[in-house]
UniProtKB/Swiss-Prot annotation:
The gene is surE. Its main location: cytoplasm. The keyword Transmembrane does not apply. Nucleotidase that shows phosphatase activity on nucleoside 5'-monophosphates. Its cofactor is a divalent metal cation. The lineage of its organism: Archaea, Methanobacteriati, Methanobacteriota, Thermococci, Thermococcales. It is an enzyme of class 3 (hydrolase). This is 5'-nucleotidase SurE. One of its GO terms (molecular function) is 5'-nucleotidase activity. Its EC number is 3.1.3.5. The keyword Metal-binding applies. It is found in: Cytoplasm. It comes from the Archaea.
Length: 259
């Protein structure tokens, strides 16, 4: 079995190294990941300049490249360089990736990119203190997240993903144990409410930060409710076809019916 591992925290993150360690007994592990932190890069591709790549030593990996691109670039590079894979894993991410806003996440978007190439994929994230989400995972225990990653990966490699499922989005609570219950969930609606905060530099010129508040009320059955309220491991099956499952004739009537 050939497994691709990537992330958005960068190839030097302890999270990706924990993932490689967990998966190395299940197959040949290839790593391609950004050289630097690329959180919240979504499914961006680098089209305006060349991409540089360098070999990096990652214990347990057959080969590992760090690239000066995005998580999506990493998946494209890996497929072009090494051919097809049996599975792609993105993570273990520093901080949860929940709700319909997974499209902002470089972690989830790398898994989505792999899925568009018909490679079954898993995005996995570990809930951590927000102050640690942009570091390299210093002092963070990835053992429980690694346990669930290995468990889920083994099942996918043995049985495949269910029909209609292209990827899994997995979120592990910070206080999880190997005995923590797993919930199969749907994506919550928008979780983060961003806005612009204006500040002024010493020369009197304005500059801006994107800031906002997280919602803390969630519907039962969603990934956010499972993680934040029930403290369960959330596994959300994702289909990359974002077509609304509605009656097309009803849409036609609403949009094009004669007055």
């Amino acid at each position: 079995m050939r497994i691709l591992v990537t992330n958005d925290d960068g190839i030097y993150s302890n999270g990706i190294r924990a993932a490689v360690k967990a998966l190395s007994s299940l197959g040949e592990v290839y790593v391609v990941a950004p050289l630097f932190q690329r959180s919240a890069s979504g499914r961006a591709m680098t089209l305006h300049r060349p991409i540089r790549a360098r070999l990096v030593d990652v214990p347990g990996a057959k080969v590992a490249y760090g690239i000066d691109g995005t998580p999506t670039d990493s998946v494209i590079f890996a497929l072009a360089r090494f051919g097809d894979f049996d599975l792609a894993v993105s993570g273990i991410n520093l901080g949860e990736n929940l709700s319909t806003e997974i499209t902002v996440s470089g972690t989830a978007s790398a898994a989505i990119e792999a899925a568009t190439h018909e490679v079954p994929s898993i995005a996995i994230s570990l809930e951590v203190d927000w102050k640690k989400t942009l570091g390299e995972g210093e002092g963070i225990d990835f053992s429980v997240a690694s346990h669930f990653l290995k468990r889920i990966t083994r099942a996918v490699l043995e049985k495949g993903l269910p029909e209609g499922v292209d990827m899994l989005n997995v979120n592990v609570p910070s206080n999880a144990t190997p005995e923590t219950e797993i919930a199969i969930t749907r994506l919550a609606r928008k979780r983060y409410c961003p806005t612009i905060e204006e500040r002024v530099d010493p020369r009197g010129h304005p500059y801006y930060w994107i800031v906002g508040q997280k919602r803390e009320e969630f519907e039962p059955g969603t990934d956010a409710y499972a993680l934040k309220i029930e403290r369960k491991v959330s596994v959300t099956p994702i289909n990359i076809d974002m077509t609304a499952r509605v009656n097309f004739e009803e849409v036609r009537k609403v949009l094009f019916a004669q007055p």
